[in-house]
């Protein structure tokens, strides 16, 4: 019976990750197609996606209140949802890698961006925004940053990103993170 519970927990976790991936991909696709949509279509689609994130967040809250064995594994997903809703991170890809706790892929993405900047495929402003997001995500995942990365982060971190990092560190417990994410969803709907 214990092994069946582990299997079910694993399957539930997989399903939740797939749902989060789908929502993050939806946000990413929306940003990529922003120019092709009129303002109303864009805002409506974004609002619907945020509502879906809110519903997903509510589901996570119910799961966490009933099954404490999932708390640690779901905390990363909650922080990712919080970041998406509060728009601390603007890049859905970074949110997805953060939620899946994949620092190696975040570092690979950072190296690709460095290359793209050097060959002129990426504008400096976008590079700076994304690098700050990735470095913040790496720090939140407990990764050691180089002195240069720390300096870059200090010089370029936005107030929103700094607030996300501060709040996510201070809150710690799942209920408080969920409460904040729920508040951010309500604020985004208005």
UniProtKB/Swiss-Prot annotation:
GO biological process, one term: response to ionizing radiation
Highest taxon above the source species: Eukaryota
Gene Ontology molecular functions: beta-catenin binding
Coiled-coil ranges (or none): 2-63
Gene3D superfamilies given in the database record: Beta-catenin-interacting ICAT (1.10.10.490)
SS bond partners: none
Keyword presence, Protein biosynthesis: no
Matches recorded under Pfam families: ICAT (PF06384)
Keywords, alphabetical: Coiled coil
Family according to the record: Belongs to the CTNNBIP1 family.
Description of how the protein assembles with itself and partners: Does not interact with CTNNB1.
Protein name: Protein LZIC
Organism in which the protein naturally occurs: Mus musculus (Mouse)
């Amino acid at each position: 019976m214990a092994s069946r519970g582990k299997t079910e927990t694993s399957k539930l976790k997989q399903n939740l990750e797939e749902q989060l991936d789908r929502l993050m991909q939806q946000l990413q696709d929306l940003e990529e197609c922003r120019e092709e949509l009129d303002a109303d279509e864009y805002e409506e689609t974004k609002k619907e996606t945020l509502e879906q994130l809110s519903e997903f967040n509510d589901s996570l809250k119910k799961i966490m209140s009933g099954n404490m064995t999932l708390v640690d594994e779901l905390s990363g997903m909650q922080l990712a949802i919080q970041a998406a809703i509060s728009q601390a991170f603007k890049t859905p890809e970074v949110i997805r890698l953060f939620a899946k706790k994949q620092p190696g892929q975040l570092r690979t993405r950072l190296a690709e961006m460095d290359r793209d900047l050097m060959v002129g495929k990426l504008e400096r402003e976008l590079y700076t925004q994304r690098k700050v997001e990735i470095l913040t995500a790496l720090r939140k995942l407990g990764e050691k940053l180089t002195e240069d990365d720390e300096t870059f982060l200090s010089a370029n971190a936005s107030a929103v990103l700094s607030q996300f990092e501060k709040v996510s560190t201070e809150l710690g417990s799942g209920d408080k993170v969920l409460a904040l994410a729920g508040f951010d969803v309500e604020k985004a709907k208005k």
